[in-house]
Amino acid sequence: MQISNLGELLNATLIHEGSVLSVEGFAINLNELKTGFAFFNNDKKEIAQAVKKGAYAIITENDITIEDKDIFYFRVENLEQALVRFLRFFCEDKECEFLLFKSYELSLCKTFYFNILKGNIFTDFEKLIKAKKGEIFCYCEENYLN
């Protein structure tokens, strides 16, 4: 994804313009971060480690020190809302389906091998970012992902 498109999608403020034009993937924790990824996080220590691991873009809601002049740094008002906005776009591009159920109905989703979302964007991020084209997800919180 082009970094400029990512900034627009997130409605983010550009803190520092880096030198790379695109990112290869997305992560919210250091274990999943690879060189060339965009990193969504508010923890300053983890952001510093992400820079050392080769992140090309940092997205945070906090003021941070520019560690590397080649990296893009973005500030968002609310990291959780930015992740929801990003994942809605990402999942739409992959033509994922989302089915709303009552909480007691979710157990049936397991029977049909549907993916069940927990209702927390930080918990569900990895499952959604690794979604295959047309994958089906079930959830029970009506305002989730809105």
Model-predicted segments: where are they?
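N-terminal leader/targeting and accessory segments in enzymes
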Residues: M1-R85, F89
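Phosphate-binding loop of NTP-binding sites
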Residues: L87-N146
